[in-house]
């Protein structure tokens, strides 16, 4: 099996990377940074997000597994002290593939069209922190006029991240959906929004129409893009998915409990 390892630059992560690389190569596996069959992320969820964006062109051919060098993350199943167990399981190919949905973002600007994939979430705000003014459409029909700090569109697995801090719902990754959550919306007699998170199934699209004369800040996970002349943005459940190699059962709701309410 061809593998590659993406790790943080701290000593613990680098040491873990060196050990896993050496042991996998001892067992006849080849490190291949160009076309890996499995990508091992060592660090935190941010490290895995970076690995995802680095290899998103290979989503149909590869899978991910996380080793967390801090506290357990949502995308990590192993700690560094479990490296030998992970190595054995990879060697024996004792895993199942679990697929998580992604959000596809299509941006139309004066300069053409941009397409992005997000694993956690994508947001739209104003660059200078002023009020974002957009028309919102669902399924090709006008839904509302939004005024506020911004909007957040998250995946089910990303619903536990920024979306949760905004008061959005937590969604199990088995649901093929995206979630729209408002960021500090303005609601009064003049401006009125739905005020609740909206969960859209895979056959629905979300469209927003900003003011083309404004400069907007578009985020795709940890990536930031400053864009001018945006005429519209389309959000939907992506056709692509991210595949995780699951070597043991670790339910989503157990991860939620351990991260947020377990003492």
Regions found by a protein language model. Give the residues of each.
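Short glycine-rich anion-binding loops that position phosphate/pyrophosphate groups of nucleotides
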Residues: 44-47, 70, 157-159
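Catalytic phosphate-donor-binding core of small-molecule kinases
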Residues: 1-36, 72-152, 160-263
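Glycine-rich phosphate/dinucleotide-binding loop and adjoining beta-alpha-beta core of small-molecule
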Residues: 47, 51-66, 76-79
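Short, well-ordered secondary-structure micro-motifs within conserved domains or adaptor modules
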Residues: 33-53
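Conserved SAM-binding loop
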Residues: 41-42, 64, 153
